[in-house]
Amino acid sequence: MSSFNIFSITWIAIAVVIFFSLFYVVAPYGRHLKEGWGPNVSARFGWVFMESPCVVLMLILAAGTWESLNLVQGIFLALWLTHYVHRTFIWPYRVNMSGKEMPLTIALSAFFFNIITVSYTHLTLPTIYS
C-alpha cells in the first residue's frame, strides 16, 4: 500500500472519530464560545491565521510545480487561490467581527487542518486530467 493511501485512510479514520465525538462535545466557536478552552484571540485574527495556509502554503508548494501543470490543472489552482484569497483576506474584513473572540485552540486546530488539506490537495493536483 502506498504512503498516499495510508495517509488517506488515516485521514478518513480521524474524520470518523471527530464526527462522532462532536455529538458529545460542542466546539466552542461562535455562539457556543465558553471558558475552559484556553486563551481567546480576536475572531478576525483567528480567522485569518487559521485560513492562511490555504493561500501561503499552496503558493509555496505550487511554485515548485507550476511549470509542469497543464491548463486544466492551472485553472483548478487559480480557482483554489481565488477562493481562499477571498476567504482568508477579504471576507474577515467585510463581516462585522468587532469584539468577537475565538479560542486559540480552535484557530490552531483549523490551522493544522488546513496544512493537511493543502498538502493533500497539492499531492492530488498533478493527477487531475494528467
PLM features: residue spans?
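Functionally constrained cores in energy, signaling, and assembly domains
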Residues: 94, 114, 129
